[in-house]
């Protein structure tokens, strides 16, 4: 029989991907020896009450993972106040689409999802405040074929570097994954061409009945002019407003892109630099509001109702607040997938970083983790049913076949999601985005 201590798994990252994998391994009827490494502090349960981004979990992806972890009843109790209604307008305020959803993609806040998953994992399985530095092949003969994980405790000012040997290291460590970096020739994230900023405010029906009606009860989006406004209902009557700006909203960048003759089907133009846009935008809410609402490169030509919403959002920020503009990154569409690396598996953004313009990121991440856990379970069944005297060795020998099977499924799904996301980004920030959206909605 394969003992728990015979085969060790390291999961690097405690986001939705890493925690889904840990939750599914915990729920397994088999005994898996795994440790989750996370550089941040353990989130306090009270953070569930802090407004944050909402995630719509797709039935065949994120919801399938929730059910696979045995958490569906608990999930139903913590769904977001944001409904599945989606309203899409153009910059004149004309409604292009208004749908109510069919219950197939329920919303949950990111904080609530993290807490839901955390509550299903034994506390001792997660090492908080632990920064993974790198991984290297283990160099002792008895650990041949295994990986050495080097890490340090970030909660202590001066702490020595520690090392541990693992049979399998799972990279769930996001966009700038150190585990992905250990794979030869694996690409680094590239700038998608889009930057964003986020604000939170309260829009009550009593105070702003017209705004409340325009926004609706779920997600509200305005597309056009190389920009996208997205507003989502959050907990406690809060509204989360995101402004997505493509670098080409700047006239100088548009001219440069036109001259480049870049084929956008292959991905973002390498000439795009997020600093061009970020350095043109102040962080002070009052100054930023003045620039965005009056300059032709930004929202000056948008309808008065939409500009009023933006004005309310900016004026709702505290006086000394800073509104930070951040770039959005993605992994290149080609080459993909990457070469298999012995003893390593990637899930979520570490494997397939994409922008949010198809809503697939967290769904693909959770589906990755579920599929990987199920491959490990199948491998465990084969191993424990073997009559061999060294089941751990058999498990290790057959591991690469299980990882390859996982990658065939995960990378096919991820490639489709990455390509769809890129097409949606191009559509959202095209010169005639509103017309194209209307055609898509009518088809």
UniProtKB/Swiss-Prot annotation:
Pathway the protein takes part in: Secondary metabolite biosynthesis; Alkaloid biosynthesis; Mycotoxin biosynthesis
InterPro entries in the record: FAD-bd (IPR002938), FAD/NAD-bd_sf (IPR036188)
Alphabetized UniProt keyword annotations: FAD, Flavoprotein, Monooxygenase, Oxidoreductase
Gene Ontology biological process terms from the UniProt entry: biosynthetic process
Molecular function GO terms recorded: FAD binding; monooxygenase activity
Cofactor: FAD
EC number(s) on file: 1.-.-.-
Gene3D superfamilies per record: FAD/NAD(P)-binding domain (3.50.50.60)
UniProt xrefs under Pfam families: FAD_binding_3, NAD_binding_8
Family note: Belongs to the aromatic-ring hydroxylase family.
Function statement: Monooxygenase; part of the gene cluster that mediates the biosynthesis of the aspoquinolone mycotoxins. The role of asqM within the aspoquinolone pathway has still to be determined. The first step of the pathway is catalyzed by the nonribosomal peptide synthetase asqK that condenses anthranilic acid and O-methyl-L-tyrosine to produce 4'-methoxycyclopeptin. 4'-methoxycyclopeptin is then converted to 4'-methoxydehydrocyclopeptin by the ketoglutarate-dependent dioxygenase asqJ. AsqJ also converts its first product 4'-methoxydehydrocyclopeptin to 4'-methoxycyclopenin.
Protein name per UniProt: Monooxygenase asqM
